[in-house]
Amino acid sequence: METLFSGIQPSGIPTIGNYIGALKQFVDVQNDYDCYFCIVDQHAITMPQDRLKLRKQTRQLAAIYLASGIDPDKATLFIQSEVPAHVQAGWMLTTIASVGELERMTQYKDKAQKAVEGIPAGLLTYPPLMAADIVLYNTNIVPVGDDQKQHIELTRNLVDRFNSRYNDVLVKPEIRMPKVGGRVMSLQDPTRKMSKSDDNAKNFISLLDEPNVAAKKIKSAVTDSDGIIKFDRDNKPGITNLISIYAGLTDMPIKDIEAKYEGEGYGKFKGDLAEIVKAFLVEFQEKYESFYNSDKLDDILDQGRDKAHKVSFKTVKKMEKAMGLGRKR
């Protein structure tokens, strides 16, 4: 069975777009792959974080994974900072990366421009740590969006470089892009991806939004003026985005949605979608609360940490042996 790895930062509550584009797809693939789902809190601290808020959001994200349908008997869910091998392997990969290739990373450039009190070194060395996250578990598949594709390509380059210098120690991962239609856009500006860090709360629906508030956001979402319910990302981005959300939450094919609402106006469609979103959030949040407030969540994270440590420790030892670190035993 091939291995799949995915990491999400606990830097905010995931949106309904994250659910449709990632979490829901993870539930589908956990039967077909040996899956590792990592809450990458060490990546989060490359930018300043409030420690209490970070810990709360880490626990929230773990509960969200489980509420989405991740089964701890099928997949490994764990917290990055609880498995020391990540920073160990991250440092080893940092030593074979060049400053030039790290400075060329688009996310580094974007975040460096926003840095107020100097550029944190962690922003620059973020990609080798991300590469370590992946290679530690002999990962074959990494599902990512366009914004992370460059980092995975760097990971593949670092694997090639490491294997060339120290023999074939690491597995080279392949990139898997999200399914077509899995990309959910901003509700008020459907040319931009929905983001949990958006300054305007009307642009996104958080998985922990109050359901009635989320329904209002759907009803006020931007659409065009012709009133025809048709999936056309280039010419009708607003209604296309809402159709994507409808399809993502109901599993109804897009063609069937178009047929169902043929001759209907946007008001009817938005009203129905608002109720679908509301019902989804009510059920989702009930599951979330049952995990967040339970000791079972800690048991699952302990179990995931122990398995991740066992697997990653073996990879780190292979890397250290290849590089000549430590004593020969």
UniProtKB/Swiss-Prot annotation:
Cell compartment(s), UniProt: Cytoplasm
Gene Ontology cellular-component annotations: cytosol
GO biological process: tryptophanyl-tRNA aminoacylation
Residue numbers covered by motif 'KMSKS' region: 193-197
Keyword line: Aminoacyl-tRNA synthetase, ATP-binding, Cytoplasm, Ligase, Nucleotide-binding, Protein biosynthesis
The protein's Enzyme Commission number: 6.1.1.2
GO molecular function: ATP binding; tryptophan-tRNA ligase activity
UniProt-listed Pfam families: tRNA-synt_1b
Annotated residues for binding of L-tryptophan: D133
Chain positions of motif 'HIGH' region: 10-18
Reactions the enzyme catalyzes: tRNA(Trp) + L-tryptophan + ATP = L-tryptophyl-tRNA(Trp) + AMP + diphosphate + H(+)
Annotated ATP binding sites: Q9, P10, S11, G17, N18, G145, D146, D147, V184, K193, M194, S195, K196, S197
InterPro entries: aa-tRNA-synth_I_CS (IPR001412), aa-tRNA-synth_Ic (IPR002305), Rossmann-like_a/b/a_fold (IPR014729), Trp-tRNA-ligase (IPR002306), Trp-tRNA-ligase_bac-type (IPR024109), Trp-tRNA_synthetase (IPR050203)
Main location: cytoplasm
Binding partners and assembly: Homodimer.
HAMAP family the UniProt entry points to: Trp_tRNA_synth_B
The protein's role, per its UniProt record: Catalyzes the attachment of tryptophan to tRNA(Trp).
NCBIfam families, A to Z: trpS
Family stated for the protein in its record: Belongs to the class-I aminoacyl-tRNA synthetase family.
Protein name: Tryptophan--tRNA ligase
Gene source species: Staphylococcus aureus (strain Mu50 / ATCC 700699)
Organism classification: Bacteria, Bacillati, Bacillota, Bacilli, Bacillales
